[in-house]
């Protein structure tokens, strides 16, 4: 009887330790555990028939996302950081939006990077709103840390439009990824001036530089 009670206590203790580590039944809870090494997953949002947000003058989010993501990849690989892209062309990753998002999350979870960064563009009904915004999963300490670092770097581009990193618990990628992940909204396509910036190669270089610098600071 004593032996059974002792075994039960040991089992309960181990279960408690697993919960504290953010692991249950062999799976990390969303955004709770950092991956190993210096592998980064870059996720260029949307693609294919899913153009994402449309700019005031017709700019398509999917194209801007991919161009900026490829620039970030180039900067990171030049510094010896391994990068996996969820997409490197204009193709969608699934027949439906849900299937597409599931595949992106599957890649993140399978590769288990130290950080996954999903690149997007924003839009809002108020045409005057502009500036980059970084989101993280609300319950992820690692995600919060990464988001704050990236937000700080992006705020340097134009301090007038500085923002704070925001927690979110509803975005599919944020709540289903088992690794630290952030969503970077580089700017607002609903703002005419920012749309013009976001389609320019020079400004894309600037944004890519800020994001890659933030990633490197997070890794360090």
Q: Language-model features: where?
A:
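Hydrophobic membrane-insertion alpha-helices, especially the h-region
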Residues: 1-15
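Catalytic-core regions of hydrolytic enzymes
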Residues: 22-40, 46-148
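Hydrophobic/aromatic residues positioned on beta-strands within the core alpha/beta folds
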Residues: 43-44, 186
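Peptidoglycan cell-wall recognition and remodeling modules
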Residues: 50-54, 92-93, 158, 162-164, ...
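Sec-exported extracytoplasmic/periplasmic mature domains
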Residues: 70-81, 109-113, 151-159, 203, ...
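Conserved beta-strand segments of alpha/beta enzyme cores
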Residues: 82, 161-164, 180
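Active-site-adjacent mobile loop/cap segments within catalytic or ligand-binding domains
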Residues: 111, 125, 167-220
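Active-site-adjacent substrate-binding region
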Residues: 143-165
